[in-house]
Amino acid sequence: MTIDKYHHSHQNVADKLVREYEGPTPFALYLKTYFAANKKHGSKDRKSISAICYEYFRKLSEAFPLRNFISSSIDIPKFTASHLQQPLLFIRARPGKKELVKASLEKAGLFFESIGEMTFALPNTSSLQNIIVLNKEAVIQDINSQALASLLKLIPLTEKPLVVWDPCAASGGKSILIKDTMPSVQLHVSDIRENILFNCEKRLKEAGIQPASLQVVDITLPFAIKKQFDFIFADLPCSGSGTWGRTPENLQAYTEAQLNTMTKLQENILHHLMPAIKIGGYLLAATCSVYKNENEDQIEKLVATGKFKLIAQQYFIGYDKHADTLFGALLQKMAD
């Protein structure tokens, strides 16, 4: 078969896959299921078909959903245009491991760029298997997720270890960031999903981190507060609109109704977390969204209660770095 015929064949398969995709299954899993059921596609076929599919979704960025809800801090033309290119793969070297990680990448002959003190950027398709010991030597973490450490550093440490809670632990990346940035803290970890928490525990163990507690907690509902914390790092559920360069299928149809549902969920979570913070303690609220409703508006509501003072907030811009765009705000609790 000629190159043109190969491309035409792949284009036809990709067109069919895109037409039949209805969500909510992540498109990457949808593709994986299709390829598992159609063994005729070899490795090169799979890569070509996948690339054509994702190129289609990236072109949808010209009609990025709910543009009128995007924060004024975002340069919309630059942000939407960034979806035409695949984001980079970022890794963060653990404390004391940068030179080891750099040497390992060089030995493997991988193309990479060293950024700042601890970060390396690689092409998204790079494989790190058998090159570095993930979680022990370095963690895969977007450069702007790493940048949230700049807000962590605004929290004053005391002689007595701070009692810290990561209530939306997911895969454990934030917990590792907390311990790498604030080594002395007493870290408590939870998530609503037991299976996710199991994987989180495994990852923390690989990172050499033993949390003070690790348990399933549903913070979308009222819960018994057995003790208050010096600091809570709430990575709030959100639209994920700052990361759609990695999952461009989401550009297809995200609605105002979905955004409203998400903001109400965020409000519930923040309402339930507020009493769990000591007076004088801190809350770091973060999202991977570019929508003002999920970010500045939520922070304004917290400040309006009279119970919190805003210390700092910012968008961590990714469209100039081939990275995700995140939002973070650090607040101090002033009253119950």
Predicted features and spans:
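S-adenosylmethionine
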Residues: 1-336
